[in-house]
């Protein structure tokens, strides 16, 4: 019974997982959050270079909705990681490793977006939702999304 007399308590639907599983789940989420910004930046740099011929801090700040100092700080981090090269007065360029990461991120996004479209989500919402989901989906789940999409007819 619940605290209110006469009202039965609802059964618990889920059980608490063991400690190791719980820890691993939270570790994976933290790792996904860490990778999320990195992926977004390298993908944006790649897109800007492809679409407008250059990637400038001012353009990145505008598209990400952040300040230029925030972009500058992240670019230093990406350079330290070996993902980009910054050339004064010329812009930001991806290294081979950075371009590979951008391509992988773009593919993950497309798989998730196509899956959402097959489910009937509108194109605008599918694009937006995929932007957040792509970073938090395992390879196994991506493979399942890809297979489902192929079976049910999308791009």
From Swiss-Prot:
Similarity section: Belongs to the DtxR/MntR family.
Keywords of the record: Activator, Cytoplasm, DNA-binding, Manganese, Repressor, Transcription, Transcription regulation
A molecular function GO annotation: protein dimerization activity
Superkingdom of the organism of origin: Bacteria
Family annotation (NCBIfam families): PRK11050.1
Self-association and partners: Homodimer.
Protein name as catalogued: Transcriptional regulator MntR
Any one GO CC term of the record: cytoplasm
Residues covered by the HTH dtxR-type domain: 34-95
SMART domains to which the protein is assigned, alphabetical: HTH_DTXR (SM00529)
GO biological process, one term: negative regulation of DNA-templated transcription
Subcellular location: Cytoplasm
Note on domains (UniProt): It contains an N-terminal DNA-binding domain and a metal-binding domain.
Alphabetical list of Pfam families matching this protein: Fe_dep_repr_C (PF02742), Fe_dep_repress (PF01325)
Function: In the presence of manganese, represses expression of mntH and mntS. Up-regulates expression of mntP.
Protein's UniProt keywords contain Manganese: yes
Gene that this polypeptide is encoded by: mntR
Cystine residue pairs: none
């Amino acid at each position: 019974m619940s605290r209110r007399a006469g009202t039965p308590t609802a059964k618990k639907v889920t059980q608490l997982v063991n400690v190791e599983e719980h820890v691993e789940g939270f570790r994976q989420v933290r790792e996904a959050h860490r990778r999320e910004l990195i992926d977004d930046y390298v993908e944006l740099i790649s897109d800007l270079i492809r679409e407008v011929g250059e990637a400038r801090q001012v353009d990145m700040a505008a598209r990400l909705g952040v300040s230029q100092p925030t972009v500058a700080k992240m670019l230093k981090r990406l350079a330290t990681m070996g993902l980009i090269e910054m050339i004064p007065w010329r812009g930001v360029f991806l290294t081979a490793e950075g371009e590979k990461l951008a391509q992988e991120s773009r593919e993950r996004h497309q798989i998730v977006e196509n899956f959402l479209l097959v489910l009937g989500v509108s194109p605008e919402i599918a694009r937006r939702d995929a932007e957040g989901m792509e970073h938090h989906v395992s390879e196994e789940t991506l493979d399942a999304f890809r297979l489902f999409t192929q079976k049910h007819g999308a791009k």
